[in-house]
From Swiss-Prot:
Catalytic residues in the record: K247
PANTHER family: RIBOSOMAL RNA METHYLTRANSFERASE, RIBOSOMAL RNA METHYLTRANSFERASE PB17E12.10C-RELATED
Binding site for S-adenosyl-L-methionine: G87, W89, D107, D186
Protein name, entry field: Putative ribosomal RNA methyltransferase PB17E12.10c
Pfam families reported in the protein's UniProt record: FtsJ (PF01728)
Family: Belongs to the class I-like SAM-binding methyltransferase superfamily. RNA methyltransferase RlmE family.
SUPFAM superfamilies, per the entry: S-adenosyl-L-methionine-dependent methyltransferases
Organism of provenance: Schizosaccharomyces pombe (strain 972 / ATCC 24843)
Reactions accelerated catalytically: a uridine in rRNA + S-adenosyl-L-methionine = a 2'-O-methyluridine in rRNA + S-adenosyl-L-homocysteine + H(+)
Amino acid sequence: MSMRIWSRSSSAYSAIARSSSWFNNSLFSSCLLRFYSNPPKKTKKNTLISLRKSAETANEKFIEKINKEHQLFKPGQIVVDLGCAPGIWSTIAARHVGLFGRVIACDIIPCRLPENSSMIQGNILSMEIQLEIAKAAIRSRNSFFRNQQDHNSASIPYLQSVFEEERDTKEKAKIEDLSADVIMSDLGPPFPMVQGFEFWISKLPYLAMQTNEHLAVKDELDSLYLAQAALLFAIKALKPDGIFLCKVLESSHLRSFAEDLSMCFKCVKKIQFKTKIKDELYAVYFCSGKQLSCHSKLLNI
């Protein structure tokens, strides 16, 4: 009985090799096709990123709409943003006030802002932080007036006047000296954060805002309390023709707050805003024409 020995030169081996190569190539092609035709699975991180992005876009469109309808921001203004993180409202305000204006932002969580802005990290409920906001506004105003005058910035009289202004600012500054054109208040729960540079530079204050019972905004009453604190600050720090924009969680407790706003401002408009994060409904009050006779002791606070 004869036995046939298969070799590489045989036609049968070549046929098997060709069929095997075709099989491997088709398997590889089908794997590629399956990989690229099916979208990747959504992870928790990707979902959080898309949620935050949609929330930022909604906030940006909202404040731009208010600015377009009511001319909220103008060049050269001093704007105060309470609860500024992640800096959406402050960035838009800085874009409109220009280089001769100033945005002074305050929050427990730090954030990056444009060059014509000042970031003060702290709790707005602290009187020291409120004074720091006033000092930042005074410094900005003094700097603007100095730039309008033709002085040699390296001369001794000029430097001496700068030092004297800074000393007077530290010693005599009051909240009433702020004279802000616009005060915005968005004191609420922090935006969701994902792992990255932003999270690691603000990890501790972010966790404090989430867990500390004195800092966390848990319900409508906490949101109302912070809005009332912002109103008391605005009564002292706002210009007579200034604008107060306040965002507060919608609830049945807002009637007394609306009465307080009507006592302090001639014109009060209520705008509703729905967030993308927790699907919560907020009331945004646009207030103008500060009443000079308004006193904090007459309010329902």
